[in-house]
Amino acid sequence: MPEETQAQDQPMEEEEVETFAFQAEIAQLMSLIINTFYSNKEIFLRELISNSSDALDKIRYESLTDPSKLDSGKELHINLIPNKQDRTLTIVDTGIGMTKADLINNLGTIAKSGTKAFMEALQAGADISMIGQFGVGFYSAYLVAEKVTVITKHNDDEQYAWESSAGGSFTVRTDTGEPMGRGTKVILHLKEDQTEYLEERRIKEIVKKHSQFIGYPITLFVEKERDKEVSDDEAEEKEDKEEEKEKEEKESDDKPEIEDVGSDEEEEEKKDGDKKKKKKIKEKYIDQEELNKTKPIWTRNPDDITNEEYGEFYKSLTNDWEDHLAVKHFSVEGQLEFRALLFVPRRAPFDLFENRKKKNNIKLYVRRVFIMDNCEELIPEYLNFIRGVVDSEDLPLNISREMLQQSKILKVIRKNLVKKCLELFTELAEDKENYKKFYEQFSKNIKLGIHEDSQNRKKLSELLRYYTSASGDEMVSLKDYCTRMKENQKHIYYITGETKDQVANSAFVERLRKHGLEVIYMIEPIDEYCVQQLKEFEGKTLVSVTKEGLELPEDEEEKKKQEEKKTKFENLCKIMKDILEKKVEKVVVSNRLVTSPCCIVTSTYGWTANMERIMKAQALRDNSTMGYMAAKKHLEINPDHSIIETLRQKAEADKNDKSVKDLVILLYETALLSSGFSLEDPQTHANRIYRMIKLGLGIDEDDPTADDSSAAVTEEMPPLEGDDDTSRMEEVD
């Protein structure tokens, strides 16, 4: 390590020390860094290594056109040298170096454009680790250092030293210490409470975390001790040399001691010849260890990388204990140049859709320098499970979040990443077993993508898999469904609900299943959002079997029969609508029911019963939205069912038969439940059911345990039409 200054011994040189005041904004920034507590101070090392990497990039770039630029030092590297005795940490690079003008301008007198912006961001609660994005990463050194010395040598200038204790000014002088050849040496004089950054373990930890993929070797120099076995003679020679240094000892005092030891040794050798080999001494040496041996895997040719290497990199990147499920390694060249390595994990994290979670897990590098790992603009939220790295050659190193949002380069990168992810999923879909694992974990992401990404909706829809009325225990794609469609079938039919069994036994699918029409079962809440956007697939419209206006393939004879039924039951529909009033929008004859007497369908553009259930479960729901989006209910009756036929006869025989009202309400409430809705007044419905149970058990109205108002209601059920007391069921209302 060079001496800090020789000006004290040579007065002539002292005149060459120039003092400069920091530009106001920089002084303010340094004050903010020094006087505010930050927990993640370790980022200073990342910033200084990043600066070194930039300097090395610059000299490497210049040497491409002028190889003689490297005559002052062929090797491009970064060295880290901790010194516990002096309490200094030194970062040395063989980069381009700085001229005197560079030193004065870059480290103090000219504020970078990001200085003020970074201070404002800090005061608004931004993380100190963002400092590099504003181009002022060097000043993060003052997070841990009380004084910083920068010694630098540029090919076009002398060797200079810059120094500041952050007191509002800095000095620049010609450096007469050890010649550097070319490059920059940053010496951090650490604060008393920051000595952890001199520990070998801590430095390795930080470099691995932040800088392991820098494109130049980072070598750590550590002074260590080791035991060395020597003979007693050699040990004594060493001891003698140490004694000679002490002025208090006389040479004459040493001689008899040596003779005595020698004679002792001769006697001991006779007893034990190996004795003199057993003496150990402590020897100090400098250990050099390269910390970033793992070269950026994404810069290599994919054909040269084994699955094991991808696996090791994935685990080091994600700390996952399992191997990845799939990998996509590619580069884009032309007007824009970047490389990317993307992984699909085997399982979704438990907090995949939590609001506080990072929006993505892609690490952004610019020319092998890590920039950030939470760049929201890099990939859409529905792909937030993708892990990996993107390394751009075109983005500026000091890019800020604000710049990223406006960056056209980033928009192109994002578009390419999405495209490659979809390619990866499509490739994965060819392997049925692996795709099944993928879909179990990430189907929600695909469906969220269909809801959010209109541009890629078609490709994403090809990745969907569903159970259907014909698929058994296998999930099938929409393409598979289309290949099995009937000749005269125009639509893709689907039903949404909570479970596979629930939708399979639903009244809505009765006629479709009877006619051999396949129905897709959508049983995840997100399916409701997905089909709101996915209107069609391969020219076939997706139609919900729980909504009004269901069109089924039918011949002329079936159409004629249906019209006759509508005419026959027109009067009953009118009576039922009058009884139910505002509870339903209309009552119509159904073309979808076979074994159920009736069902509740919803209007084409309203919510389904399942969607209404989902929305009611939202803790922060908007009740005004609930009001106008809640399903507009239509009651459909089955003209072929005995209950409906008997009810029609009863209503036509006596328009004023009051039992009809109760029967209609009971049918409506039961249909609500079977169609997936909830009851507004479940207790009243329960009372009706209890009365039916009493009738079934033969419990008489006069039974003292029976409720007066509830016991008589059963007398008005259809089998008891002849009973005189026809008005009893009115009481329940």
Curated annotation (Swiss-Prot):
The modification Phosphoserine is found at residues 231, 252, 263, 454, 477, 642. It comes from the Eukaryota. InterPro entries: HATPase_C_sf, Heat_shock_protein_90_CS, HSP90_C, Hsp90_fam, Hsp90_N, Ribosomal_Su5_D2-typ_SF. Residues 285-733 are annotated as: Interaction with FLCN and FNIP1. The modification N6-acetyllysine is found at residues 58, 84, 444, 459, 490, 586. Its main location: nucleus. GO terms for biological process: activation of innate immune response; cellular response to heat; cellular response to virus; positive regulation of defense response to virus by host; positive regulation of interferon-beta production; positive regulation of nitric oxide biosynthetic process; protein folding; protein stabilization. It is found in: Nucleus; Cytoplasm; Melanosome; Cell membrane. GO terms for molecular function: ATP binding; ATP hydrolysis activity; ATP-dependent protein folding chaperone; disordered domain specific binding; nitric-oxide synthase regulator activity; protein homodimerization activity; TPR domain binding; unfolded protein binding. Keywords: Acetylation, ATP-binding, Cell membrane, Chaperone, Cytoplasm, Hydrolase, Membrane, Mitochondrion, Nucleotide-binding, Nucleus, Phosphoprotein, S-nitrosylation, Stress response, Ubl conjugation. Homodimer. Identified in NR3C1/GCR steroid receptor-chaperone complexes formed at least by NR3C1, HSP90AA1 and a variety of proteins containing TPR repeats such as FKBP4, FKBP5, PPID, PPP5C or STIP1. Forms a complex containing HSP90AA1, TSC1 and TSC2; TSC1 is required to recruit TCS2 to the complex. The closed form interacts (via the middle domain and TPR repeat-binding motif) with co-chaperone TSC1 (via C-terminus). Interacts with TOM34. Interacts with TERT; the interaction, together with PTGES3, is required for correct assembly and stabilization of the TERT holoenzyme complex. The TPR repeat-binding motif mediates interaction with TPR repeat-containing proteins like the co-chaperone STUB1. This is Heat shock protein HSP 90-alpha. The gene is HSP90AA1.
